[in-house]
Amino acid sequence: MWKKLPSPGWLAFGTVVTVAGSGIAYDKYEQSQIRSLYVNHVRNEMSSSLSTNVKPRKLLVLVAPPPNDYLDTSLKLWRRWIKPILHSSGLDYEIVSGTKQGEIRTEIASRVRQLRKELIEQEQQQQHDAQSKKSRSWLDWFKWCRGVSTTPDPVSEESPAASFDTRSVLGIFYHNEPQPVVTEDSLLDPSVAGGVICVGRGAYKEYIAGVHEGILGPLEEPPKVVESDASSVTDTTASAVITENPSVKEISVTQPAETAVAAATVGTTMNETGAVNTDSTPAETIPAETTPTENTPIETTPDESSEEKEGPKISKPYILPSDYANASIPAELSKPLIIDPKTGAPAFFEQPLLVVAVPNLSGFTTIPTRIARFYQKRFLCEQVSHSTLAIVEAKSRPFTTTDLDLSAYEELDWPKSWVESGKERGSEWVQPLQGDDRVLQKFRVVEPAIVPSLQLKEDQSKKQELSPENK
């Protein structure tokens, strides 16, 4: 034991460390309690089992990093407070993340365009089947008049390869007949089927822009405007110089695959008949390095592996927000309810939408606010867990124009220098979010206020237990 108290410096140091550590430990403990409360509630409420041929309800999760930060910042919020609740509820999910601006918008727009193509093919197939059925009915009538049997023979029409099933040979369906696999979303009410979670204000902006681009934009990419100067420059290259070199002529005849590369390297131009245009430029003016030989390495285009390393391709918007009013809703999406032909569930943009803000401050002047938030993460945990419970229970309402400002307070944390530079280069995130009423009326948004807070209930029950009236 100490014979005397430590010095005032050590006492101050011990007090600061104890208070700081106690605050962190208390906040971590409260976070774990809140997470356990929601996880246990969801596990008990979603304890019903599904049939073996039914796939569970599936959510689409879009994750974008905060400005001037890494993607792991948003993924931490997802892994800590959203994923455990979805895992305990038994719901399936698909994550789409983007590290660059435009990746999520490009992915969402391509999915909407793919859905439109599938709907068009489905409608064409239905028309073709109806036409063939009509023509077949007349053919059967003529056969019936002649006394020919019109009943098809299933044994003769069905091929042995089509009727063979390995599972039947193994005896899997000996006691139970095979059943078609369906999704739970196709069996539920359209207002509670599926769901979309946008983690971050940036992901929400790209989701709205991507849906509008896919619905109001064209199916194919608009043609790019090519400047005429580029073609004139290539036509004026000194291509006739190579005509005096017999090696080039030999390559152009025997190796057509290398001719294009060699011609692009030295700047040769070919006419429609395959002959090389001639000029008065002497052959001695070309350096020896430009003449393609067997020892000269030929430049090739980057392979697919290098493209995969660069990341997904980000395409420019097929339609700008200023052109939304002039565009029309396509005929395949004009129905009140759009059903995905593959899953039988409503289209993902008609499913309930939840937006989760990712507060993230940076900079030296924001250190006091960052410290205060660090010791109060339990409140953010409660907010995110409560919102996740709302989408699990599918508590939603129709989308309104004011919902375009969901999680708009997150933009207050964005660095001002980043916002200013984004405005200069035309960044998508710093632009005001615009929407078309014809598209927005297809959306549904999750309303957490409909679901009572479990943490609030827990606090009220504890107060009632500690009140003097209950003692």
UniProtKB/Swiss-Prot annotation:
It is a single-pass membrane protein. It is found in: Mitochondrion inner membrane. Residues 281-300 have a biased composition (Low complexity). One of its GO terms (biological process) is protein transport. Residues 1-8 are mitochondrial matrix. Keywords: Membrane, Mitochondrion, Mitochondrion inner membrane, Protein transport, Translocation, Transmembrane, Transmembrane helix, Transport. It comes from the Eukaryota. Residues 272-317 are annotated as: Disordered. GO terms for cellular component: mitochondrial inner membrane. Residues 26-471 are mitochondrial intermembrane. The chain crosses the membrane at residues 9-25. Pfam families: Tim54. Component of the TIM22 complex, whose core is composed of TIM22 and TIM54, associated with the 70 kDa heterohexamer composed of TIM9 and TIM10 (or TIM8 and TIM13). Essential component of the TIM22 complex, a complex that mediates the import and insertion of multi-pass transmembrane proteins into the mitochondrial inner membrane. The TIM22 complex forms a twin-pore translocase that uses the membrane potential as external driving force. Belongs to the TIM54 family. This is Mitochondrial import inner membrane translocase subunit TIM54. The gene is TIM54.
